[in-house]
């Protein structure tokens, strides 16, 4: 069908008109995939929001970023994926009109960029906690976390709202069943919009995230070496606390790194296709090539609840209390869950009273233990004691000793003592006669 792209309610870019229509099976498969991602994304992130808002132990400043991320992913799944795109895929064309296309693209841009920027704030928070644990716990608060979240939304909206006012545009892409920012048109407005979004809304967060997590990994490695050196000097209780703190610290770093990696893999294809369309061979941007980033982006909303349900002990504990059937369905390793709970039980839950994150409490515990060991070493008396040996000891030899010319020249004489003559004596060695008067 040469006019498969025709839509009386939409302006279709001429780039997409040169390609043949994709098979019907592709539309239906894409619609089913988007529906599954939308349902799982809404359900999973809805559970995360419910548990984090209901469970008091999870209501920490650091976890406010997780709630914000879950809210962003929930709304992204609800509006930008299912059901609008699913319906269009089954009907094989966009059916909601030009105005809805702009709103759809705007919502996708805002919530997509919000997810990336929230990941950036999570990495900054983890960096401050692990690299500067004593100061991070004092500075981070619910108010500061709220201000950072407001900044995330303002920053994301600034870059997403440009096409609404003529800086770029929102239009149909790929198989023409969803709308996104225009990365096909090669004019000054579109190109400047793409370049600025790539630098400030994509590369800038990536650089910050990589910087933070590189330093986190280096810090974790250094802490492990320090804990290994301390292990020989700690008693059993302190050693267990140290091991629990190091284990929890490593797990928290791994959780955050996995989440960030998943998000970057979800949004990097969009950046690659946009740059290819603007500066590379545009004929490579086929409907299939343009639709693959859409699938990665829509699936990003389901990663975070899955990662946290598997890796976050306190979150799993909240699931077990409210939704035990999820643990049964997913077949969690109960022994691993208990081990994680035991490990975290060794760390005082300071955030319940002071508002600081679990990370800060763990790091403060480790720092306090290290300071205690240093204080104990300083209290032990130095050996040898200061001032020993006394000054002037041992005394110097008397003046003129030994006398000059001592020993005399030629002493001992050559051949002294004389070597024994003849073969060694035969038989047993002679026995000395007993002293007189002894029987």
UniProtKB/Swiss-Prot annotation:
Positions of transmembrane segments: 27-51, 64-90, 103-124, 145-165, 193-217, 255-276, 287-308
Highest taxon, organism lineage: Eukaryota
Bias (Low complexity): 369-381
Motif range ('Ionic lock' involved in activated form stabilization): 125-127
Residues of this chain annotated as glycosylated in UniProt: 1
Residue numbers of N6-(retinylidene)lysine PTMs: 298
Entry membrane topology: Multi-pass membrane protein
Biased composition regions of type Pro residues, renumbered to the chain: 382-433
Cytoplasmic side: 52-63, 125-144, 218-254, 309-439
Region (Disordered): 369-439
Lipid addition sites, S-palmitoyl cysteine: 329-330
GO CC term (a single one): membrane
Free-text description of this protein's post-translational modifications in UniProt: Contains one covalently linked retinal chromophore. Upon light absorption, the covalently bound 11-cis-retinal is converted to all-trans-retinal. After hydrolysis of the Schiff base and release of the covalently bound all-trans-retinal, active rhodopsin is regenerated by binding of a fresh molecule of 11-cis-retinal.
Signal peptide location: none
Similarity comment: family membership: Belongs to the G-protein coupled receptor 1 family. Opsin subfamily.
Function: Photoreceptor required for image-forming vision at low light intensity. Light-induced isomerization of 11-cis to all-trans retinal triggers a conformational change that activates signaling via G-proteins. Signaling mediates the activation of phospholipase C. Subsequent receptor phosphorylation mediates displacement of the bound G-protein alpha subunit by arrestin and terminates signaling.
Annotated protein name in UniProt: Rhodopsin
Organism: Alloteuthis subulata
